[in-house]
């Protein structure tokens, strides 16, 4: 994650503060002097998620006088934890850093979790390319209870006051002397060196991992020791004089009892305990132990793992024998070789080369040990935390092949004419406020909520595609019923895949154009064009690879799911992916448009989202009409079997005929058009349309995002019992009439739900 995203998050924090405080003029001035971009966060919930402030937000709501802004929450957090320390942030007190996902920043982990070690290029920590383990990072970060801003200080303990470095009495002159001697070894000081008298801030990497809390023991020397070992080559290490080799161990003269006491006294193990234990191990693994630190030299495979201060003492953290295995690279996807191969394959698709997983430079004496000595404790990043993952966005690993450009006036005019029939028309408020947000009702978590009438056709089409992903693809195929109870992350992922399928299908499965709002005006409306505040702000992103499209939508899904223009953005993306020229060729009448009176969706728009072509009819193939004078009119219908089906009340009234390409789709999901409204009907049986025997008695589920539905509606369809068509239609729910256009004369049991009339 680059600095631009960090800057945008910070700007969003300021905008939220100004907005919540009612500083409207200041907000306007800020938007003028610093316009928003695609990376701007315009939703307060999204801002809390990015900064991981959910825990603080819940705590704040429970208070008698809750704060109103995220900036105040962060400020109060730091004041509560660090505002009362001695001298109020003196030179020895590190300044906390937010745990915001960014490059070269790691999420703190707990010792009880699975051991993970990330290896990457240590030659330049600020420019090193790091492997992204986004899903693992997210799962691990969600387990951080209480310390949401970086796990600095346990919420159940008062913060420690900053103390000077603890040393063994009488050893201070030796420490100072050793430090000065080692400082002379290099003419150019390393980036990690922080001299005892300097007033500089510690590195943010150390702060984020909680190393600034509690009594800090010999941290400057330890930092230099790590950097020193990193810069030392094998040849220089082997030929180093015995006198110089003793200078490094002299830095670690803090008492082990002090370190272990701070670890044992805490009820829960903190990162300080991990640091202390590993620091003790450093003392043991030193090539030559000083006289005042008696320890026997460990074999190479023992040096690759942390050990206890004594062989007979149990591990401080209660780790099992598994935890004492030789330290290797543990990644969710397998070992380092497998991970590197996957990265190489991914980068080969992108036409670039990945940064290799770093091979450790071993001392000559260690090379004979093979794999057991492949990773030494000194080779881990300078924070020495074993359980850590790198959280960074996908673009940092895979550079997407995306061509982006701002929309111009001519394109905006074409789109408006295609949508409304005139460039003077605009989207109404129902469209502007509609996005693809999911229901919070426990039994309807799969459902997309509709705020008002208007874009129901778009919502129903997207709902059908989301159900396709939830029920019949991926891991959900084994248990369709479980697919109706998705997690928030899973349903968002299915929404991403559904949107990707829609725009990719509209682009002929060769290209896709994704329209995103930038919050900045891209052109000045002139002439025969009426601005609506939406089209003028668009940035158009073209992609020619489906995998890149999914990744891009995953990064931008908040604009579609949270909004406010999610429904509009998808509609425009489908239009631009298909192109305005081809859509006009799809129409029976070239002057047709996609949005009708009162903002209702036309059949052409629904067909565009379901099949990728904006044809005007629902029958199969093409019908030729001969007027008798030699002129033949072509009426275009559905060209192939659709993934999602369609049923219409108009067919019951003999006003249209729905062909089998829509009546019998690949998946048992149907968009239902009834009374100028679109809703969804689906089955949990994937074989419903493949085996006629399953169509004797089966269940269908009905969902209407606009009906304020509070419970699941399950209909039982019985085709063995026929219902007379002469029944008074005024008393028959229109939904039953739509169902009988597919299953003639079938009886419909609402199973206790109130029939929708």
Curated annotation (Swiss-Prot):
Comp. bias (Low complexity): 232-242
The keyword rRNA processing is annotated on this UniProt entry: no
Residues bearing the modification Phosphoserine: 219, 223, 289
Pfam families, A to Z: MINDY-3_4_CD
Polar residues: bias regions: 254-277
Membership in a protein family: Belongs to the MINDY deubiquitinase family. FAM188 subfamily.
PANTHER family tied to this protein: UBIQUITIN CARBOXYL-TERMINAL HYDROLASE MINDY-4-RELATED (PTHR12473:SF8)
Name this protein carries in UniProt: Probable ubiquitin carboxyl-terminal hydrolase MINDY-4
Chain's gene name: MINDY4
